[in-house]
Amino acid sequence: MKRIALLIIAMLTLGFAAQAQSTFSKGTTTANLGLGIGGTLFDKDFSVLLPPLSVGIDHSVASGLFDGNGSIGVGGYLGAEVYRYKGFDSSVWSQTLVGPRGSLHYQFVDKLDTYFSLILGVNIISWNYNMKVADVAIKDKDTSARFGWGAHFGTRYYLSDRWAVMGEFGYGLTFLTLGATYRF
């Protein structure tokens, strides 16, 4: 009877210990590399020269929140895309979103990190075009910078201790981003 009781206690202890292994505990740093789908600036009149690519860093500054399954991360984000406008003889447009990123993580199940993130930064849009109208050449080149932001619901599923597949859905450079995460 004592052995059965000890076995049950050991199994419960191991079960709770396995639950306590967080995917994003305090001090953890992750790096994302993503490919965006469904841009927010360019439409069907543009063709892709460089698809929306993004990199992000996320560092956990607090964990053990919300029944021990939540954590807070801070980091940065950089995303860029380049398109050619089909209506002009030669036209290239680019968009870059860069800024700090904050995230709120909650682990529902083992190996799955779910989170909400907010990016507040700068959106840089550049264009360079050449066209002819009635045999008159028109050229323009400019860059503008304005407040940029992004908000995403994301998830990372860890395939190993270090590597995860990730997906983010929301607003920013694109509506959907898929990619990989490396955990330091």
Question: Language-model segments: which ranges?
Answer:
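Residues on the lipid-exposed face of transmembrane beta-strands in outer-membrane beta-barrel proteins
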Residues: L35-G39, L53-H59, L78-A80, P100-L104, ...
